Structure formats: structure tokens, C-alpha cells
């Protein structure tokens, strides 16, 4: 599947927020059936998933129990974007490893450049009311000051253009985010996702993203 799928999100930005999702993108045009069969084969130890095919994505939902007491139900969502068959920046490989008493292995994972990942995240920040998008952008910008912001904005514009008929102007984006910053649900979105000792202030994140990115849209 190396040539067909790219991974997105937290494994690249080193964000420490918890997620029960695996997010993939099918970057080669063609039938998705063989790819989903391969994913199911690799995850067969989780049991048979519930499938949810849609026009532009295909999602597998797995439900299983934890392996140590107290036993509790867990779930995993594997969602693949089957629409955006292109890459703006450079495809990169990053190291990924698992080291636990159950399983130890390492590999390289295909993904987008960090700028392209964050371009899609900047789109998500406008389109949905989830404070985790602001958090992810803030952490990535803080950890990687060397980012090519021009490339990030170029990626944002491309992804926004294929998502909406009329991309927002700068002031529209600012007004959109100001409304969200006054929304308790948006501000509280990261509470259950971050470790208790996480030092995060959404107002600081808002100011950074506004000044560094949104101001140049």
C-alpha cells in the first residue's frame, strides 16, 4: 500500500493529544476495493469492522476490549480520504515505531511534507468547530519554527479551493475564528484529549496562528 496511501496528522507533528483515529489519503486514482481489503487483512486481529463507504471517504470502525483489567470497550476508526489524489509538496518518509510488551516493531511511513499537512489543518480550522485543530497548528508552529510558511499557505489555498465554491477572504477567516474563540465547546474540545499536565492556552494559540498564518491568507 506504500504507493497508494499517505498517513496524516499527529504522527508527523509530534502532537501529544490522544486520538482513536487513523487518517489516510488515497493519493493514486483507481478502485479502492483492493486497498480496503489489504487494510482489513492487516488489522484482522481486531475482528471484523463495520464499513461506512461515502462519496469521498471510506471508514472502517473496529470495536474490541482492552487486554488488561479492568476490561473496557475500545474502538478504532480508520478513515481514508478517497477524493484528493494529488500532492502539492514533497512526499516524505518518517520513522515510526511501537515498543510495548505485546509488540515491538519499527518502519518508515509515507506522508506529506509538514507544510502540506498543516495546510489541510488550517482548512479544517475554518471548516469545523474543533479546538484540536488550533492546538495542532500551535504545537507544530512552536516545535518547527523553520516551517516554510509560504508553502503552507499555498497548500491551504489549494485544498480550500477544491473544498468550497468561494474560499474565504482573510477577514472572513478572522471573523470565523473569533466566533469560535467565544464558543465554550470549541475551547473545551481538547480537555479530554490532552494529558492532565499539558500546558496549553488557546488564547496564545489563537494569537500565534492569527499573526503567523491567517494574516497572510
Describe these PLM feature segments.
Residues 1-11:
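Short gly/ser-rich loop at a beta-strand->alpha-helix junction or flexible surface loop bordering the NTP-binding
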Residues 12-16, 22, 27-217:
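Structured mid-to-C-terminal alpha-helical surface segments
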